[in-house]
């Protein structure tokens, strides 16, 4: 019994690693809630329609993912080099934090989108290194549990600054400031929270798995990318998993990133949207912990398909969404499964790759994840513009989940 308890007791380094999830998740929550509202206000001031607003927001998200897709493998291979991972991780965090603050200085929609792209690329770049740190922070037998706790505490911890920011925005008039000023303060508060929660990891992390420093490191990184891609032909499990992950997680991130923009385009009440997404974070906390515990009883090959099937149902439900109460139902169900699918995918991948090449492989992982979500956002944006219906755009995401489910079953049999 004591051994079982000891197994789930986090080390100081594991706690520091999890704390970064608490910090960056605050930025993720802001991107999913208040930042689209900020952009919507600027877009309306610039004469954009609701459909154009949703489309341009989707195009900006697509631009981020294309840039991330190009940079991730390069950053990932550099990260595997001795003493490279922490400095480049620190730089990416700095880019994200500075960009988060700078968004509040934009007065028109186009500069705002450009700064948003800058900040989101920094955030996405930091995750290449953060995810690859998992193999240095803990051992394979603890990866599912630690990864799940990272997402779980990230969800609930991100609510702390968000509640403060939400109170500022909703109560701006009562404290004598404009809503735009309140949004500026929200961006600053989130940036400070992100920075402060990063410091323990920067102090404690030491790279355990690495390759030695070589001359012409950048040139060598491209050579190693080529070698890894060739090796994927031999490692069929990793190859098929990445193809499956490319599809299903693309749909997951699109739903998360565009939820507020989608609800706003449908004309739903802004306050209701924000509170519903806060509920998503609260529901996601225990749900992620539950999936972490279930991973000790059932293999990820069983749990991940359950999550994919649930998201297919979410996309289908979104196609018929018209009323505020339906958005609340959607928010709760998304919260139930988003932690499980993200955490189990990350830990499952960490267990099937060489630990000394974790940065290199997680560079590919991020291409197929956050770096590949341009497909989902493009489906939503193009579908919305062609049909004039946001429901059609979001509902079309079900294709990604069906294909992802089939490919994952193939990978699990390899």
Model regions: which residues?
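A membrane-interface helix-boundary motif in multi-pass transporters
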Residues: 50-52, 169-192, 382-401
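Multi-pass alpha-helical transporter architecture, strongest
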Residues: 193-204, 395-414
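Helix-loop junctions at membrane interfaces in 12-TM secondary transporters
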Residues: 103-116, 319-331
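Structural signature of the two symmetry-related core transmembrane helices
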Residues: 87-102, 302-317
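Glycine-rich segments within core transmembrane alpha-helices of 12-TM secondary carriers
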Residues: 147-169, 366-376
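Helix-loop boundary and gating motifs at the non-cytosolic
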Residues: 7-65, 237-269, 273-276
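Helix-to-loop junctions at the C-terminal end of transmembrane segments
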Residues: 70-84, 286-300, 384
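Juxtamembrane intracellular "pre-TM" segments in multi-pass secondary transporters
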Residues: 2-14, 206-243
């Amino acid at each position: 019994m004591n051994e079982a308890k000891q197994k789930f007791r986090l080390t100081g380094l594991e706690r520091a690693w999890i704390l970064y999830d608490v910090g960056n998740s605050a930025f993720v929550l802001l991107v999913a809630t208040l930042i689209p509202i900020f952009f919507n206000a600027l877009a309306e001031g610039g004469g954009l329609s609701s459909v154009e607003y949703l489309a341009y927001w989707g195009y900006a998200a697509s631009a981020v993912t294309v840039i991330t897709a190009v940079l991730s493998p390069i950053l990932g291979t550099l990260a595997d080099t001795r003493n490279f991972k922490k400095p480049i991780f620190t730089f990416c965090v700095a880019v994200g934090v500075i960009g988060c603050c700078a968004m509040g200085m934009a007065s028109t929609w186009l500069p705002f989108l450009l700064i948003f792209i800058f900040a989101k690329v920094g955030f996405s770049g930091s995750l290449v290194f953060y995810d690859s740190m998992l193999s240095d922070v803990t051992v394979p037998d603890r990866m599912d549990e630690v990864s799940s706790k990272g997402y779980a505490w990230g969800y609930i911890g991100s609510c702390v600054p968000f509640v403060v920011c939400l109170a500022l925005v909703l109560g701006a008039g009562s404290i004598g400031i404009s809503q735009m000023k309140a949004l500026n303060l929200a961006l600053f508060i989130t940036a400070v929270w992100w920075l402060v929660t990063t410091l323990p990891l920067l102090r404690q992390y030491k790279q355990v798995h690495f390759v030695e420093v070589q001359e012409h490191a950048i040139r060598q990184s491209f050579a190693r990318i080529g070698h890894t891609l060739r090796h994927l032909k031999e490692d069929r499990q990793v190859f098929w998993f990445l193809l499956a992950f490319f599809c299903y997680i693309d749909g997951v991130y699109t739903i998360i990133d565009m939820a507020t923009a989608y609800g706003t385009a449908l004309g739903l009440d802004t306050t209701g949207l924000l509170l519903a997404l806060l509920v998503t974070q609260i529901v996601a906390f225990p749900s992620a912990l539950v999936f972490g515990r279930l991973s000790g009883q059932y293999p990820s090959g069983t749990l991940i398909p359950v999550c994919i099937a649930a998201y297919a149902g979410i996309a289908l439900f979104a196609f018929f969404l018209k009323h505020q109460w339906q958005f609340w139902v959607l928010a709760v169900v998304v919260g139930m499964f988003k932690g499980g699918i993200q955490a189990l995918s990350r830990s499952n991948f960490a267990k099937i790759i060489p630990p000394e090449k974790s940065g290199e492989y997680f560079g590919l992982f991020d291409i197929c994840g956050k770096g590949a979500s341009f497909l989902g956002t493009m489906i939503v944006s193009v579908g919305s513009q062609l049909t004039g219906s946001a429901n059609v755009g979001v509902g079309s995401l079900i294709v990604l989940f069906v294909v992802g489910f089939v490919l994952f079953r193939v990978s699990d049999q390899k």
